[in-house]
């Protein structure tokens, strides 16, 4: 049986790890073992943060909507409630974009939400 020599494959594997670890500080970009360990952590962080990013953007959209709603004498909570009662289906991403780029359209949505809200805050919504 022929002898298997692994140097070519091993060097290729190590070179790929070190190439992908470029830009890391210190030993993490130069030593194979440290680079490999850092690459595993990097992939874990990337996987976790791709999912966390969605929540971060939702928080940002809500902050922007709330700031714009307060300029129209409403709160975020009342705006969303009013839009639901008025049966206006606009997601938070679009609302935040309108709040930043098209203030007139956002104001129109606020007025529609105000009109749909009951006069008494504690009164149940009309069925």
UniProtKB/Swiss-Prot annotation:
PROSITE patterns: RIBOSOMAL_L20. One of its GO terms (biological process) is ribosomal large subunit assembly. Keywords: Ribonucleoprotein, Ribosomal protein, RNA-binding, rRNA-binding. Pfam families: Ribosomal_L20. GO terms for cellular component: ribonucleoprotein complex; ribosome. One of its GO terms (molecular function) is rRNA binding. SUPFAM superfamilies: Ribosomal protein L20. InterPro entries: Ribosomal_bL20, RIBOSOMAL_L20_CS, Ribosomal_protein_bL20_C. PANTHER family: 39S RIBOSOMAL PROTEIN L20. Binds directly to 23S ribosomal RNA and is necessary for the in vitro assembly process of the 50S ribosomal subunit. It is not involved in the protein synthesizing functions of that subunit. Belongs to the bacterial ribosomal protein bL20 family. This is Large ribosomal subunit protein bL20. The lineage of its organism: Bacteria, Bacillati, Actinomycetota, Actinomycetes, Mycobacteriales.
């Amino acid at each position: 049986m022929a002898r298997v020599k692994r140097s070519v494959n091993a060097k290729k594997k190590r070179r790929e790890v070190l190439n992908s670890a470029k830009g890391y500080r210190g030993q993490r970009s130069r030593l194979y073992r440290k680079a490999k360990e850092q690459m595993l952590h990097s992939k874990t962080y990337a996987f976790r943060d791709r999912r966390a990013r969605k929540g971060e953007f939702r928080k940002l959209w809500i902050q922007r909507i709330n700031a714009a709603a307060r300029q129209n004498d409403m709160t975020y909570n009342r705006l969303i409630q009013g839009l639901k009662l008025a049966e206006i289906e606009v997601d938070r991403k679009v609302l935040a974009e309108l709040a930043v780029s098209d203030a007139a359209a956002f104001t129109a949505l606020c007025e529609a939400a105000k009109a749909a809200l009951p006069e008494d805050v504690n009164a149940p919504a009309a069925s």
